[in-house]
A protein has these predicted regions:
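Catalytic cores of nucleic-acid ligases and guanylyltransferases
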Residues: 1-192
Length: 192
C-alpha cells in the first residue's frame, strides 16, 4: 500500500503541483484538515493543470443523432512534417454541433467520385460497438484548445475548444510547440 504525500505548507504544495506532474499526476487535492472523504460528496477541491495549444482540425465524427458534429478530431505536425492525430473535442451544445457541421462541410476531403473521405479508426475495448469512422477535413482550420497533459503524442484527456484561430496557418501547429511536463519518477511521489 502506498500513501500520497501531504502537506499543510502552501509553498511545498505549489512545488509539488509542478514537480509531480511529470509522474503522470493530474494535480493536487486540497481539503480542510478536519474533512474526511465521503463518497458522493464534493467537499474536497482538485486543482488540475491547464494549458492551451493550437491544433489542426483533421476530421469529425457525426453526432449520434445523425447530424451535427459529435467530436472534432485534432492533429499536429511532427518533426518529419506528418500530420498526426493527437486527440479530439466532444463537448458541444446541440446548437454548436449543427453550426460547426455547417462550417466544416466546405472543408471535407472528397474522393474522385466526390464522396467524403472517411477516416477509419480501429475499435477498442471501450468502443467495440460504436462506429469510430470520421469524415476527413482539409488541414486548414486551426483551433486553440485547452488541455491538461500530453502523453507521448496524444492529449491525455478530452480537450476543450477555446477559439478558432483564422490568423494561424495549419502548418505552424507543431507537436514540439506543446508544453510538456518534465519527467518525474512516480516512486519518488509515493511513500511506504
Amino acid at each position: 500500500v502506498h500513501l500520497s504525500r501531504y502537506t499543510t505548507d502552501l509553498t511545498k504544495a505549489r512545488h509539488w503541483f509542478v514537480e509531480f506532474e511529470g509522474a503522470g499526476l493530474d494535480g493536487l487535492v486540497s481539503k480542510r484538515l478536519d474533512s474526511a472523504y465521503l463518497p458522493g460528496k464534493r467537499g474536497w477541491l482538485k486543482t488540475k493543470h491547464k494549458r492551451t495549444a493550437d491544433a489542426v482540425a483533421i476530421g469529425y465524427r457525426v453526432h449520434k443523432r445523425g447530424h451535427g458534429v459529435g467530436s472534432l478530431l485534432l492533429g499536429l505536425y511532427d518533426p518529419d512534417g506528418r500530420l498526426i492525430p493527437v486527440g479530439g473535442i466532444g463537448s458541444f451544445s446541440d446548437r454548436m454541433r449543427d453550426e460547426l457541421e455547417t462550417e466544416l462541410l466546405p472543408l471535407l476531403q472528397r474522393d474522385a467520385d466526390g464522396d467524403p473521405v472517411r477516416i477509419e479508426k480501429p475499435r477498442s475495448r471501450f468502443s467495440s460497438s460504436k462506429d469510430q469512422a470520421a469524415l476527413a477535413l482539409e488541414p486548414s482550420l486551426v483551433v486553440e484548445v485547452a488541455f491538461d497533459q500530453l502523453e507521448g503524442s496524444r492529449f491525455r484527456h478530452a480537450v476543450q475548444l477555446v477559439r478558432f484561430r483564422p490568423d494561424r496557418q495549419a502548418v505552424s501547429c507543431l507537436l514540439e510547440q506543446v508544453e510538456r511536463a518534465p519527467s518525474y519518477d512516480l516512486s519518488q511521489v509515493l511513500t511506504d
